[in-house]
Amino acid sequence: HPVEI
């Protein structure tokens, strides 16, 4: 995953 929040 590139971005994970």
From Swiss-Prot:
Q: Where is this gene product found?
A: Secreted, Cell wall
Know the name of this protein?
42 kDa cell wall protein
**Which organism's genome codes for this protein?**
Solanum lycopersicum (Tomato)
Q: Which UniProt keywords apply?
A: Cell wall, Secreted
Cellular component GO terms held in the UniProt record: extracellular region
Q: Report the superkingdom from the record.
A: Eukaryota
